[in-house]
Amino acid sequence: MTDHRHHPVPILIETDLCDDVDDAGALAVAHALADEDRVRILGIGINTSGHWSHSAARVLNGYYGRPELPVGILHPTTDAIGPEDYARAISRMHPSAATPDRMPPAVDVLRAALADADDGSVTLVSIGYFGNLVALLDSPADASAPLAGRELVRAKVARTVVMGGVFGRRARPERGAEPVSETNFVHDVGQTARFLGEWPGSIDFVGWETAADVITGRTLPLTQGDDSPVAIAYALHSGKGTGRPSWDLLAVMLSASELEGHIAWSEPGTVAVDDIARTLWTASADGDHRYAKVVSSAEQVADIIDDHLGRPPRQPVGSISASVSEVEAWS
């Protein structure tokens, strides 16, 4: 395992924090890695427009003792909620974090964080949709950075980890397989295609199949307590003690070069999408893309991720102002 205790990896996280609870789990894992000095979280971009997602990120940051972390959101903002509404529910646990008066555009947060980072140092983790990242590429120079977006990314981002797509046998139409779509790719096909085709540098992908059997979060009520916002999010989304596949959590773990010996990488190649967002993979020696493959058991990988997901905050800030029963009653 790579030792980052003296050189934590600077990471920027792009998340939807809305439709599926693995986004909340991924932020929890990122904070646990930060507590170990494996990573240093520079900021968070919300790539959906519902302001409850923004406030939920702030609740989680505060719960883990980092209320100062900048959080941006896709503009214009809305009152939209996800189908299970966990973001609004955990926001109401901490009303001071739920006020929508501090919601800068995500592109501004991303640009400022990159501008302040050392050249070639940042790992960008995308666990949602691609609108903010495409907007970042298109962004002009401004007061935070003299470089336009594409040049800023090229100068500052050393590595990009993306949860998205479906790989392996299903992504090889030349071998007779029928390609399939995946949620993050299908959300906006045009933006997905632009991101895949225009993003500077290499991209490491965590495909749907990589983590579909890696179930985590079942023990959160025991490891963090019933009133943890992470445990509540999982209970509201999937049911208490049920757990959820670890798509986004696995991407965050790989951003810190964790899971050594449990994950292997494909040959290099190029990822694209067709007009209905089905994943198209072309192996190529000079390609900038590759995808992760689990080479140990799903249970072993889940145990390692659960160890991080279930860790209580090292230095929590403030108190939670509602119990799990009250939050469930609101939902």
Region annotations inferred by a language model:
Residues 1-331:
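N-terminal acidic, glycine/proline-rich low-complexity segments
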